[in-house]
Swiss-Prot record:
Flexible loop: annotated segments: 297-331
Location of the protein in the cell: Host nucleus
Name by which UniProt lists this protein: DNA-binding protein
GO BP, one annotated term: DNA replication
Record: residues binding Zn(2+) 1: 284, 286, 339, 355
Entry superkingdom: Viruses
Composition skew (Basic residues), residue ranges: 129-139
Length: 529
């Protein structure tokens, strides 16, 4: 009996047929395991245990028994054959992965047709494609897209995604989309081709602020074709064409919506002068009332200016001897007007805070301001505002380049009243044009000259830059009107061009100091050491 129990206790399952804790199943008995044999187990520790037999109750013997946990009751092969098979547990279905977003590859025709592609940051975001033929396609982005995923909140990510939807918007004009610069260049090339501009000017034209010469050539050709024999008053033809080129450049930039930060294309401003409101009262560019100051002019008797003064101003001109004992023509003006900051300065000299405005005859200057006001009222009778404004240039050819440095002398074009000789003899009853009657009733014109003009038979004061810029106030307004006519003949829509209003600034002050100017040098070191 004891030996049988020992056999049962020492019986261990064969290798590959299950572990000691788990009895082999029918699958293990019927077919050998296809898996490789497990690694060899380490040697089992044995312990001594006393076993008592039934026959000899007093006697005891020691037997070596392997140290194993208590085995389950063994089952024979017959019992295994009769025992029912255990049902296998079905493996739980693996969670299906979310389908990957569909990748739709654009066709080669669609890729070639797309000229501009951008993302509209709406909610949900959309992909906007602009085709070369003016076609505009708006496609809602899939929520799996990185752009759409970055804009979604945590609550929105839990919601199911919606299907893509495409909306096709056709350009009603069917015009290809171009940039602002290309739009301006296309209009400029059309004008230069039509009016036969020089090829060099046409090739170098890039719609830059300092490229007025090419547009002035367009205006010059248009004047020769449409307005041959144009009458100008105290205006040079070159200055008139230059101002037309500036106004045309302003219309081109307004048409193309191109702007430059520190450059105004017209170079002009609207000054509310208020010099024709009160009789005998003039105001300078500061907006202050100008003061009376005696002004004495001496000219050589044999000079052209001296002879002209004796003929035209015989009541004021007289021949006297100067301090060197020479005979000169002297004209004394007691009605001269100057800026309030020049009260302590001698004639033709200005302080550092002066605006540089000076009139030798205040009455003639006021007549000129009344003339331009009446001219504006005759030209635009229904205008509610603007009759009291003066269109004045702020740059002559000396300071027309962008980014120029201040130079010695006056920083704004000189404003001088010119009298219309023999205009008093005209019969106003025979003239029906109100714009012409403005000059008959007020026989003087405001003329804009170079900032620091150099007159004939005289030397330049200070050696500053000078040019032959000269245009009257009515002709400056006519230049703007003619540019509008030129534009209307070539384009259907006239863009809105705004001339800024003049405001006094310290940059317009008279400069008595000449600042050194540097010239660019390509060398890295100034000296050869």
């Amino acid at each position: 009996m004891a030996s049988r129990e020992e056999e049962q206790r020492e019986t261990t399952p064969e290798r590959g047929r299950g572990a000691a804790r788990r009895p082999p199943t029918m699958e293990d008995v019927s077919s050998p395991s296809p898996s490789p044999p497990p690694p060899r187990a380490p040697p089992k520790k044995r312990m001594r245990r006393r076993i008592e037999s039934e026959d000899e109750e007093d006697s005891s013997q020691d037997a070596l028994v392997p140290r194993t946990p208590s085995p389950r009751p063994s089952t024979s092969a017959a019992d295994l054959a009769i025992a029912p098979k255990k049902k296998k547990k079905r493996p739980s279905p693996k969670p299906e992965r979310p389908p990957s977003p569909e990748v739709i590859v654009d066709s080669e025709e669609e890729r070639e047709d797309v000229a501009l592609q951008m993302v509209g940051f709406s909610n949900p975001p959309v992909l906007i494609k602009h085709g070369k033929g003016g076609k505009r396609t708006v496609r809602r982005l899939n929520e799996d897209d990185p752009v759409a995923r970055g804009m979604r909140t945590q609550e929105e990510e839990e919601e199911p995604s919606e299907a893509e939807s495409e909306i096709t918007v056709m350009n009603p004009l069917s015009v290809p989309i171009v940039s602002a610069w290309e739009k301006g260049m296309e209009a400029a090339r059309a004008l230069m081709d039509k009016y036969h501009v020089d090829n060099d000017l046409k090739a170098n034209f890039k719609l830059l602020p300092d490229q007025v010469e090419a547009l002035a050539a367009v205006c010059k050709t248009w004047l020769n074709e449409e307005h041959r024999g144009l009458q100008l008053t105290f205006t040079s033809k070159k200055t008139f064409v230059t101002m037309m080129g500036r106004f045309l450049q302003a219309y081109l930039q307004s048409f193309a919506e191109v702007t430059y930060k520190h450059h105004e294309p017209t170079g002009c401003a609207l000054w509310l002068h208020r010099c024709a409101e009160i009789e005998g009262e003039l105001k300078c560019l500061h907006g202050s009332i100008m003061i009376n100051k005696e002004h004495v002019i001496e000219m050589d008797v044999t000079s052209e200016n001296g002879q002209r003064a004796l003929k035209e101003q015989s009541s004021k001109a007289k021949i006297v001897k100067n301090r060197w004992g020479r005979n000169v023509v002297q004209i004394s003006n007691t009605d001269a007007r100057c800026c309030v900051h020049d009260a302590a300065c001698p004639a033709n000299q200005f302080s550092g805070k002066s605006c540089g405005m000076f009139f030798s005859e205040g009455a003639k200057a006021q007549v000129a301001f009344k003339q331009i006001k009446a001219f504006m009222q005759a030209l635009y009778p229904n205008a509610q505002t603007g009759h009291g404004h003066l269109l004045m240039p702020l740059r002559c050819e000396c300071n027309s380049k962008p980014g120029h440095a201040p130079f010695l002398g006056r920083q704004l074009p000189k404003l001088t009243p010119f009298a219309l000789s023999n205009a008093e003899d005209l019969d106003a009853d025979l003239i029906s044009d109100k714009s012409v009657l403005a000059s008959v009733h007020h026989p003087a014109l405001i003329v804009f000259q170079c900032c620091n003009p150099v007159y004939r038979n005289s030397r330049a004061q200070g050696g500053g830059p000078n040019c032959d810029f000269k245009i009257s106030a009515p002709d400056l307004l006519n230049a703007l009107v003619m540019v509008r006519s030129l534009w209307s003949e070539n384009f259907t829509e006239l863009p809105r061009m705004v001339v800024p209003e003049f405001k006094w600034s310290t940059k317009h002050q008279y400069r008595n100091v000449s600042l050194p100017v540097a010239h660019s040098d390509a060398r890295q070191n100034p000296f050869d050491f």
